[in-house]
A protein has these predicted regions:
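Glycine-rich, acidic loop regions that bind phosphate or pyrophosphate groups
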Residues: 1-96, 282-286
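Structural signal for hydrophobic packing residues in well-ordered secondary-structure cores
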Residues: 16-22, 48, 71-82, 100, ...
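Short glycine-/small-residue-rich Rossmann-like dinucleotide-binding loops
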Residues: 23, 145, 302
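Generic structural signal for well-ordered, non-membrane alpha-helical segments
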Residues: 8-12, 63-67, 71, 85-92, ...
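Active-site diphosphate/adenylate-binding microenvironment
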Residues: 97-184
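Thiamine diphosphate
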Residues: 2-3, 12-15, 55-56, 64, ...
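Short glycine-enriched loops at secondary-structure junctions
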Residues: 46, 142-148, 221-225
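Redox-cofactor binding/interface segments in oxidoreductases and associated redox assembly factors
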Residues: 19-20, 42, 142, 189, ...
């Protein structure tokens, strides 16, 4: 695989060609700098997003068309040129393999620390454990900062995330919509604790029970508005909020026992505070959904310290 992860900033400065596919914000200009000689190709039904009042991304070549139709045509055209560029392609593939190996080693080191108890449970661990129990044709709906680099997504339609326009609380309803449309599929819904509250969990779980839509919801509960903390530290890394022990309008503490809300609608709820307990908890949630045909909520206590928030803010 040539997939390099979900953070483009590391590779943009040395890229000589950038193909943007149906993406209105492919990078953050204030954070990510392009190679000045790079050629930017934008592909999509509206490659320039002409209905946006302001959009300042460069475009050396705009290709208007459906990505599903255009990409196979582009692949066919590139295959002809590849015949004369074998050595360059092999060198590039070897370089990328090395980078991916370094990424995998760093990620595994992080997972090993959590597994050994020398690091606290975070989003990467949740993703790692989910990846151990999910099947390729399961559907994952995420309104969270889930570490997608730890999730193997191999099947089309197996992942749904929030749109660029946002919509706080989207995740719970979207997951039930996916289950309603694909009843034979197992559906995971991963949300932050703030997104869970925005999703109106009481009516969401009522609808799940009333319409027989057993979804397994995983709450990554860091007891805060993580996006607010990240954005604040990104804009004002040395500001008053960064030196505050508990910045206002950020923390959701004391945290409710979210896993008990689902029990009011005859669902299965469980709380996880120890990383070692998460795999078994997920299996119990899957049993509730698959065997008992009940919805389930796993309330996972995670950490998100200021160092992680600052690092995320500049990716």
């Amino acid at each position: 695989s040539m997939h390099m992860g979900y953070e483009p900033g590391t590779y943009l400065p040395e890229a000589d060609a950038i193909l943007v596919i149906d993406c209105d914000v492919p990078w953050i200009p204030s954070l990510h700098k392009l190679n000045p000689d790079a050629k930017v190709i934008q592909l999509g039904a509206d490659p320039l997003f002409e209905n946006y009042p302001v959009r300042g991304f460069p475009c050396d070549l705009g290709i208007r068309g459906s990505a599903g139709s255009a990409i196979p045509m582009l692949e066919e055209a590139m295959a002809i040129r590849a015949k004369s560029a074998g050595a360059r392609i092999d060198a590039r593939r070897a370089k990328i393999a090395g980078i991916k190996g370094d990424q995998a080693a760093a990620n595994q080191g992080r997972i090993d620390k959590i597994a050994s108890g020398t690091a606290a449970m975070d989003n990467a661990w949740v993703a790692h454990c989910l990846n151990q129990v999910k099947q390729d044709d399961d559907v994952l709906v995420s309104e969270s900062q889930l570490a997608l680099g730890n999730i193997a997504l191999r099947e089309p339609g197996s992942f749904f995330g929030t749109s660029p326009s946002g919509g706080l609380g989207w995740g719970l309803g979207a997951a039930h919509g996916v289950k309603l449309g694909q009843r034979a599929k197992r559906v995971f819904c991963v949300v932050g604790d703030g997104a869970y509250m925005f999703g109106n969990p009481t009516p969401a779980h009522f609808v799940s029970a009333a319409y027989d839509l057993p979804v397994l919801t995983v709450i990554m509960n860091n007891k805060m508005w993580g996006s607010v903390r990240k954005a604040t530290l990104g804009l004002y890394p040395e500001g008053a909020a960064s030196s505050s022990n508990k910045a206002p309008l950020t923390y959701l503490d004391p945290a409710p026992e979210y896993h008990k809300i689902v029990e009011a609608s005859d669902g299965y709820g469980e709380e996880v505070t120890d990383p070692a307990d998460l795999p078994a908890a997920l299996e119990r949630g899957i049993k509730a959904v698959d065997v008992d045909e009940r919805q389930a909520v796993i309330n996972v206590h995670t950490t998100y310290d200021d160092a992680a928030a600052k690092a995320d803010a500049v990716r």
